[in-house]
Amino acid sequence: TFSDDMDGLRKVPDNIPNKEILEKNLHKPLTSVPDPFKKCESFGQHNNEMLKKFLDEFKFNYIFKSSTETYKKGLFNEALLLVLEQYEKINEVILPTLGKERQKTYSPFLPICPDTGKVLEVPVIEIKKKEGKIIYQNGDQKIETEIIDGKCKLQWKVDWAMRWYAFDVDYEMYGKDLIESAILSSKICQILGKKSPNGFAYEMFLDEKGEKISKSKGNGITIEEWLKYASPESLSLY
């Protein structure tokens, strides 16, 4: 079980208390955002604990991995350097799927700002493959950074492929809205030098309005709410 807890907080969910805490920390990795529930060290850790509680209650056999820890401990370093080595080939896969303006600024690498701690989506103006570094433009500053040890993270489609490569993933499930993304990530995994995993696409869960349940909107139902009205066995059906 892998938690994308190094993703930047893009928006404030509607069903979260103390929203001002999150509003002050937008674009920071979830593990760098204070917990609005004031129970854990970070919002990311709160979400991780909720996930592990669910898995434990339903007796899943799992190994938990945190994106933040995996990046910062250097467990992705080899794969990240390979992404840098194959930078041009990966962009050849991604860029045709983007609009013209986005193509001008896209890079697989998202630097972590050394001053604010935010995940930056900024133009990369030079790559240094032998040194394992990139130079990016942040406002009027040109900043050089290593790509390893948690100083950068990857855009999610490249991150997905890199993770498959690093962990030798051979089976992956995803919602049907991610089928096209899985195809792209499979191509990138093959560029990195490994066979992409077998995939299984499942149907989407919809709310009472027939709309997709969104984590950012918070328009779903929690496990605790479900179990107030139904048995654990009923949830196991899903």
For every predicted segment, state its role.
Residues 1-91, 185:
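N-terminal Rossmann-like or analogous alpha/beta NTP/dinucleotide-binding catalytic cores
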Residues 86-92, 96-238:
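Alpha-helical recognition segments enriched in aromatics with Gly/Pro capping
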